[in-house]
Regions:
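Generic internal hydrophobic packing segments that stabilize the cores of diverse globular domains
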Residues: 64, 79, 90-93
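Active-site-proximal alpha-helical scaffold in enzymes
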Residues: 84-114, 157-163
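Short, conserved beta-strand segments within well-ordered enzyme catalytic domains
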Residues: 50-52, 81, 108
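Conserved "HGTGT" condensation-loop signature of ketosynthase/thiolase-family condensing enzymes
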Residues: 1-77, 113-163
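Short loop-beta-helix segment that forms the pyridoxal 5′-phosphate
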Residues: 76-85
């Protein structure tokens, strides 16, 4: 089994819903960060074999491929999108590690992206005239305190003094 290493990590700033980043689509948010992490880690973009991105609030299509095309990655790099609530970005990273360990790829860029400002709008019923923003469904019993993953991450970071 081939060894796998994480050689870089970056994230965007956090912005409130309808805040300063609300005009940017997810590929516009993610592409500069991907370009930056590749450059900072000393990897050449043409060395990247795969891009894996988690996006749970997407409107469909293949956000990962759109991100690959918007970044400096070569056109041959595909885009695999994971649709999973909570820890989808970590799943993308773990899948990238497994691809490297299995020898199916040498360099994988992986992570997650969301834009609550740009989440899809849907009809509650097929012929309903009321538009409803897509919100994450309940995943825990009412007895558990359900918070979004980002909020949980900030609480853990604060508790352990991480910045």
């Amino acid at each position: 089994m081939q060894s796998a290493y994480i050689v870089g990590a970056k994230r965007s700033i956090v912005s409130p819903i309808n805040g300063p980043l609300s005009s940017l689509q997810i590929h516009e948010l993610a592409a500069p960060i991907i370009n930056n992490v590749i450059e900072a880690s000393g990897i050449k973009s043409d060395e990247v074999d795969e891009l894996i991105v988690s996006n749970a609030l997407g409107a469909g299509g293949n956000p990962s491929r759109l991100i690959a095309l918007a970044s400096n990655l070569p056109e041959r790099v595909g885009g695999l999108t994971i649709d999973r609530q909570c820890v989808g970005g970590l799943d993308a990273i773990m899948l990238g590690i497994k691809l490297v360990q299995a020898g199916a790829a040498n360099v994988v860029v992986a992570g997650g992206v969301e834009s609550f400002s740009n989440r899809p709008i849907r009809l509650a019923q097929e012929y309903d005239k009321i538009l409803v923003p897509y919100d994450t469904p309940e995943f825990t019993p009412d007895s558990d305190q359900e918070i979004h993953m980002a909020e949980a991450a900030f609480k853990v970071a604060e508790k352990f003094g991480l910045t």
